[in-house]
Amino acid sequence: MGFYALLLIALGMSMDAFAVALAKGAAVRMPPRKIAATALVFGSVEALTPLAGWVGGFYAKPFISEWDHWAAFVLLGGLGLKMMREGLSGKAEDVRESKRESLWMTVLTAFGTSIDSMIVGVGLAFMEVNIAFAAAIIGMATTVMVAVGLAAGGALGGLFGKRAEFAGGLVLIAIGTWTLLSHLGLIG
């Protein structure tokens, strides 16, 4: 598999993370250092999941394909509901000011957006590809896309305040629902 094919795969795998980062950036003000750290967490998780899928290879494929869509739906849906609830709360403070999110929650969110990359890793196990290089490309693309999403979302969040947090929750739920419905064959 060539570099450009891997790059297209990497960009495709980073789109869910980009959408989540856009929503997260709109809801929570982040300084540049926090943006970089969050982007690195997402990129690292996104790079590790295709490696895990590749290692699992053929034997794990039936098991993974049975639950990946449910895991994404539950993780992203739960996080989305939490964001929507916080977006609807009557508190007057600026939700973007100092909201802190634990490393664990960031990793959990990153994992929720990277489950499809694990399946890609399984597929790459059956192709002529350097999996370490492929994982590095996927991780770097995701790191860049998440940083861009957080920064762009931050610019939008100042305009929309709590509505941005509610909308971000809707985005997470939509991504989780789309993942579930597409894996169940109900949408294309």
Curated annotation (Swiss-Prot):
Keywords, ordered alphabetically: Cell inner membrane, Cell membrane, Ion transport, Manganese, Membrane, Transmembrane, Transmembrane helix, Transport
Xref: InterPro entries: Mntp/YtaF, Put_MntP
Entry's localization field: Cell inner membrane
Main location (coarse class): membrane
Topology in the lipid bilayer: Multi-pass membrane protein
GO CC terms of this entry: plasma membrane
Listed transmembrane segments: 3-23, 35-55, 63-83, 107-127, 131-151, 167-187
Disulphide bonds in the chain: none
Keyword Iron found: no
Gene Ontology molecular function terms on file: manganese ion transmembrane transporter activity
Role description: Probably functions as a manganese efflux pump.
Matches recorded under HAMAP family: MntP_pump
Family assignment from sequence similarity: Belongs to the MntP (TC 9.B.29) family.
Name recorded for this polypeptide: Putative manganese efflux pump MntP
Taxonomic lineage from the root: Bacteria, Pseudomonadati, Pseudomonadota, Betaproteobacteria, Neisseriales
